[in-house]
Amino acid sequence: MDVPIAPDSSASVQRSPPELAHAGIEVSGLTKLYKEFTAVNNLSFAVRPGEVMGLVGPNGAGKTTTLRCLAGIIPPTRGTVQIVGHHLAADPVKAKQELAFFPDEPRLFEYLTVWQHLEFTARIYQVERYREIGAQLLEELEIADKRALLPGELSRGMKQKLVIACGLLHSPKVIFFDEPLTGLDPLGIRRMKDSIVRRAKEGAAVIISSHLLHLLEEVCSHVLILKNGQKVIHATLDEVRQKFSEAGAGTNLEEIFFRATADAKGPS
């Protein structure tokens, strides 16, 4: 199970207010090598509380590797990651207590019911009010009537919702999503967008990796575009739109993505 790691709103999230100006996620010089292959090359960026950053790039750009490094699942070769001020390498327990990572493939315990998954997660994170919070999450994600079912009795989308309910149970301040809408129907997609926006408004720093660029355009305040493991663009959506509008290009995120990755050079 991936969530315990130690785990209709169409308006984009706005920039964080001044009182939340410190970084929820701070990354400096992040590099990941696999022998001679550079999967991620010298990434530096920050995501503040209340911000939602879209992480996009072609297949093989390094998106999932970046997320796995940020979540502490794999160690970077070089560079540092801080989660709400906690150094991920030096203080991994405290750092991971503040985050939730949702992989693209939900992994659950075969012989635990939906509610037992929440109870298990609550014990890991010592969530005292887990009954109240868990019930609210199941209602929000529309699986409250599935609480007695085993994973084998759930659809792909319901499994994804259960993983998300477990990951949000301890109210993480930093949230990483890797393709969060896989397996969801249109109503589930709308609910998930609402949930992402709600967490950001409550002060979480959020990163979403997705190929669904129209989703990112609806919920993200910032975008980081990668190619060949390198940063191509990191800016607010408004700044990116302005830059490409001045260059005579279209200003929706899909057109910006194709233009930016076509113009970007590979690593030297």
Model-derived features: where do they sit?
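Helix-to-loop junction immediately C-terminal to a conserved catalytic motif
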Residues: 71
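Conserved ABC transporter NBD signature motif
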Residues: 79-90, 94-95
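Conserved ABC ATPase "signature" region
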Residues: 119, 123-146
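Conserved ABC ATPase signature
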Residues: 150-157
